[in-house]
């Protein structure tokens, strides 16, 4: 398991070689959280050269959020705020990143393994598909309303917070979202957990 993460300063973290088998180009990553048991990871990744990898299947649920630069996945070009998610077993198209691009990488339920493929693995649910989102084109939604938070799955309305829901697993309810707080917002400790892992 990954240790519980409090507030960290990424400036204190060191760069490691990027964990991208079968890729061409150079990348480095800073581990924000790393599960040494199964390889799950949250990291900042920097591409030090133009970078590319063929289409294939990751050994983990894999998410990229573009902080700066440009990522092309299949025919989709993503810039700052661009996001993609591929569940384990779903084909990720060929992908490129331009030199200097930085992303947040999230990898769950598996390690850095990757195999070339042009078809999804059998046995996937119908809703397990490649997701591509441009968060800059999304509206910030107040957490006071139930959608998209789905309070029936847990959580509490939190006035003053706003989210952009990037992905939600319909079976587990697990999700990836962006959060922003209104000016002067203060947390009520019973309404919201005080730690952000990613």
Label the predicted regions:
Residues 44, 49, 158, 170-171, ...:
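A structural signal for the main folded, soluble domain(s) of proteins
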